[in-house]
């Protein structure tokens, strides 16, 4: 009779181990999905910050274009804030999944030990990217913002800088005597059709990647 009870107890433990293990696998699958979304958003954030750096460099190199570039910077700052907010939400989601996974694993390990089985490996041992420590290390990079270089503090200083830039250009032998200031080179985004800087790799308004409107066409063969 005692043997039957022991066998039934072990069968119940095996059943519970199976159910809890299936639940653990589902959580791990969700963790992987969350991390893929987190990695994708992290990549976008790096692109946004690279675009921000380009805009800041452009602002200092062409003082006369400050107003247009400042508008782009404001849009990009809002985009970065939204991206960081999304990343923080994903990080909180991964924390909750870790909190849900940990007691399940401890319970399964205890049951496995009653059957003489080894403990299951920790998440960090199975896959480094699924560990909570990995996400915490990345957070410091996500919150790093590019430092804006100093700019003229008044419109008078900006105007003086623009005049100096014009004078330097007029001294260049390649410039004609009838030189006049040209507007900043712009192009239309093919996705949202808004005017953006010609060299911008990403539209700051709709986030679409820029591409040429006039790609090279293959040469037509002469008619036989």
UniProtKB/Swiss-Prot annotation:
Pfam families assigned: zf-C4H2
Any one of the GO CC terms: cytoplasm
Keyword Nucleotidyltransferase assigned: no
Chain ranges of zinc fingers (C4H2-type): 189-206
Region (Disordered): 166-185, 204-224
Record GO biological process: nervous system development; neuromuscular junction development; neuromuscular process controlling balance; neuron development; neuron fate specification; positive regulation of neuron differentiation; spinal cord motor neuron differentiation; swimming behavior
One example GO MF annotation: zinc ion binding
Knocked-out gene: effects: Larva with TALEN-induced zc4h2 null mutations show abnormally pectoral flexed fins, outward positioning of eyes, continuous swimming movements and balance problems at 5 days post-fertilization (dpf). Also exhibited an open mouth as well as continuous jaw movements. Display a reduction in the number of V2 interneuron precursors in the hindbrain and spinal cord at 24 hours post-fertilization (hpf). Display a reduction in the number of GABAergic interneurons in the midbrain tegmentum at 35 hpf.
Keyword Magnesium included in the entry's annotation: no
Domain of life: Eukaryota
Record InterPro entries: ZF_C4H2, Znf-C4H2
Entry keywords, A to Z: Cell membrane, Coiled coil, Cytoplasm, Developmental protein, Differentiation, Membrane, Metal-binding, Nucleus, Postsynaptic cell membrane, Synapse, Zinc, Zinc-finger
Principal subcellular localisation of the protein: nucleus
Positions with biased composition (Basic residues): 208-224
Subcellular location(s) of the protein: Nucleus; Cytoplasm; Postsynaptic cell membrane
Function: Plays a role in GABAergic and V2 interneurons differentiation. Involved in motoneuron development and in neuromuscular junction formation.
Official protein name in the record: Zinc finger C4H2 domain-containing protein
Organism: Danio rerio
